[in-house]
Amino acid sequence: MAEKRNIFLVGPMGAGKSTIGRHLAQMLHLEFHDSDQEIESRTGADIAWVFDVEGEEGFRIRETQVVADLTEKQGIVLATGGGSIQSKEIRNNLSARGIVVYLETTIDKQVARTQRDKRRPLLQVEDPREVLENLAATRNPLYEEIADVIVKTDEQSAKVVANQIIEQLGF
């Protein structure tokens, strides 16, 4: 790989963006970044706290700035937050500054992967499945719209998915 290109992972919560991203970055000798972790680092607080204090709108403003900053780097793998796709500015930055990989997963798999995770503010409700279904209806078309590559993550290990991404990208 002569030039260091960016790889941006998009997809719903529970798709495996962070886990797969770490494997991918290690395999390709690239830096790994997670936009949610970067927000936590910059604010000194976790995502749930940011949602509680600033609301989703405040969180999305922070997320837009973080993604703008990170996508200006070269030679990175970036795991984006599941909702970041809703921002036109973020979609434009991802499309213009790297290769976008959509990690696709089923609602059943999302529920299984996120059911014990208390760090997901949008799922702290009585029926998280309904929330995930509603989010999928809104967000999945946006993931598909900007994706250069789509990879299904159900029933596969993170390492296998990372290898599939590398093969599809021809790296």
Curated annotation (Swiss-Prot):
Listed GO MF terms: ATP binding; magnesium ion binding; shikimate kinase activity
Residues at which substrate binds: D36, R60, G82, R139
Entry's EC annotation: 2.7.1.71
Localization per record: Cytoplasm
Residues that hold Mg(2+) according to the record: S18
First-level EC class: transferase
UniProt keywords, alphabetically: Amino-acid biosynthesis, Aromatic amino acid biosynthesis, ATP-binding, Cytoplasm, Kinase, Magnesium, Metal-binding, Nucleotide-binding, Transferase
Gene3D superfamilies per the UniProt record, alphabetical: P-loop containing nucleotide triphosphate hydrolases (3.40.50.300)
Cofactor remark from the record: Binds 1 Mg(2+) ion per subunit.
Cellular component GO terms held in the UniProt record: cytosol
Amino-acid positions noted as binding ATP in the UniProt annotation, renumbered to this chain: G14, A15, G16, K17, S18, T19, R120, Q156
Pathway(s) per entry: Metabolic intermediate biosynthesis; chorismate biosynthesis; chorismate from D-erythrose 4-phosphate and phosphoenolpyruvate: step 5/7
InterPro entries given in the database record: P-loop_NTPase, Shikimate/glucono_kinase, Shikimate_kinase/TSH1, Shikimate_kinase_CS
Catalytic activity, as annotated: shikimate + ATP = 3-phosphoshikimate + ADP + H(+)
GO annotation terms (biological process): amino acid biosynthetic process; aromatic amino acid family biosynthetic process; chorismate biosynthetic process
Function: Catalyzes the specific phosphorylation of the 3-hydroxyl group of shikimic acid using ATP as a cosubstrate.
Subunit structure: Monomer.
Protein name: Shikimate kinase
The encoding gene: aroK
